Amino acid sequence: MLRKIIRHLIHFYNRLRLRNRNFSLITNTCIGGIMYHELKMRFLSPTINCGIRDHEEFFTFCRHLDHYLSLPLQFIPSQWKYPVAELRGKHGDIKVYFTHYHSEDEARTKWEERKKRVNPDNIIILMDGDNCTTRQIESFNALPQQRKAIITMDEHPDVPSAWAVADPNYKQAQILEYGLWNQTIRWYELMDYVHFFNTGKIRDNALFRLKKKNRKTA
C-alpha cells in the first residue's frame, strides 16, 4: 500500500511539473512509452512498445528521422514470438523489434497511427545506452537534434548529452526496473527527466539523489 501511494505521489508531482506537453519522444527501447504513460500523455511517437537494438541503426534513424518516418514497414521472418520489421532507406536498413505486439497488423497500425502525430518542432531523443562504447556515446552526442540524452552506466563528464546512473547496485539492462527505495523507484528516475523534457537540460533528480560525483548538472 505504501509503495502504491509513493508511486502515485511521484506521478502526480511529475505531471504537475511538466510544462512541455506536445513533444515527440524518440527512443531505442520501451522507456519512452513508460514515460508517456506515467505522465498521462498521448503517444506522439511511433517508438512505443518497440525497440531499435542496433546502436548504429538507431543513430542513423535519428540522423535521418524524416526520411525513415516516411517509409513503410517491411516485415521479415522473426525467430521471436513478436513481429520484426525493417525500414529500408537510402542510408541503410533499420530493424525494429515490436516486442509488445502480437501481430504484424497490430504493429503496423500503431506505428502508422503514431508516426502521424510526430511533432517535428518538438523532437526529443532519449537513448538507453548502458552498453554503448565511448565512441558510440560520442556519436550519439553528435546527432543533429538539440534536445537529446543518452543514459549510461558510467560517467562521461565530457559528453554533454550523457547522463550516468553511476550506482554500484545498478546492473546493465535494468534501467526500467524498480531498484531503489525498497523496489519503489525505477532506476531512470534518478534522472530528472521532467526537467529535461521542459528545458532540454540534464541533471540528477534531487528527490532521489542529492549529489553524484563528477556530474555537471544544468
Which residue ranges define each predicted feature?
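Polybasic, proline/glycine-rich intrinsically disordered low-complexity segments
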Residues: M153-A206
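Positively charged, amphipathic N-terminal segments that serve as targeting/anchoring signals
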Residues: L18-R21, I26-M127, Q146, W163-Y170
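Short beta->alpha connector loops
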Residues: G129-C132
